[in-house]
Amino acid sequence: MESPHRRIRTGRAVIPALRGKPAFEYLADQPDLAKIFNDAMTGVSALAIASVTAAYDFRRFATIVDVGGGLGRLLAAILDAAPNSRGVLFDLPQVVAGAPALLSEHHVKDRVRIVEGSFFDAVPEGGDAYVLKNVIHDWPDDDAVRILGNVRTAAGTDKHVLLVELVIPRHDREFLGKWTDMEMLIGNAARERSAVEYGRLLSRDGFRMTRVVQTASPFSVVEATAI
């Protein structure tokens, strides 16, 4: 097996070499491990939730689609902050199976429609805003463009896409995203991106990046409009 140093130099992912298939395909075949992963991602959402909902006003969107939203922890917090909005939680069947309990716990289940599917195939239509938290950083550019292309197909003109990500800043100081950038590269041949890189990526799919909203946490909200 290649060393991590060689993986960094070549840009090839470790997990396919170790497990014989990409990370998310491997998780799909390992339900116990997938549960640990999904619970961990819910925990990561908890780190970002308060800062994201404090920094960004979701109340102007009637329908919010959480793409790759896992168990729905972020969507639940968004709907709590936007009491007149409704949500669509979209993720793989084995992932959203556990969502009703969490949504009920947070008293938003009656305002959420759960849709099963893969964002590589299609994304639910009808959203005013499409939220993707820690989705795009999991994928190299070609796959990221495919995902965002499906979001653009679902979204009408002037609708919004909101990427909640660790946006690499323009400084050399310590930043969490610089560590996860290396993790994404070694694990998935993916990476964290700067604001400029997100702007270029979004423009390839018919979005115009309008702003990057920093939060009190390391996460930022990259806002773009479908054109």
What are these regions (language model features)?
Residues 53-54, 58-227:
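Alpha-helical subdomain
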Residues 1-63:
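Conserved Class I S-adenosyl-L-methionine-dependent methyltransferase catalytic core
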